[in-house]
A protein has these predicted regions:
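Short, charged/polar N-terminal "headpieces" of proteins
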Residues: 1-51, 112
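Short, surface-exposed, charged amphipathic helix/loop patches that serve as local interaction elements
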Residues: 35-112
Length: 112
């Protein structure tokens, strides 16, 4: 287990730069979510969800928002700290960031 420059223990699942580069080749957009918990830093790597995954998560959200979050998390998670999925506080913190990453992007419409 490594420590970062702030002295926090880093839990990243042993993900390497080579893993990240491979994922970028497979998924185009890959992002890292860091969740600090006391003297620990939990790191997770995610990709953008497919339209099918977003539809599945939206369908589940009508009856159970937490289950919807689990669907999205599990479908986008590439690697990193398994504690992010198992610890409810870490999970909810990661989900906040994941929702930001997959949320609406800036767009515009122009009349021609």
């Amino acid at each position: 287990m490594d420590k970062n420059k702030e002295g926090k223990k880093v839990f990243d699942g042993g993900v390497t730069e080579a893993d990240v580069e491979k994922w970028k080749g497979q998924h185009r957009k890959v992002f890292r979510i860091d969740v600090a918990d006391g003297d620990e830093l939990h790191v997770g790597y995610f990709h953008r969800p497919s339209l099918q995954l977003m539809a599945a998560a939206a369908k589940v959200a009508k009856s159970d928002e937490v289950k919807s979050g689990e669907t999205l998390f599990d479908g986008c998670f590439l690697g990193g700290s398994e504690e992010m999925r198992q610890d409810s506080v870490l999970f909810l913190s990661a989900m906040q960031e994941l929702n930001k990453a997959v949320g609406a992007k800036a767009s515009s419409l122009k009349n021609l």
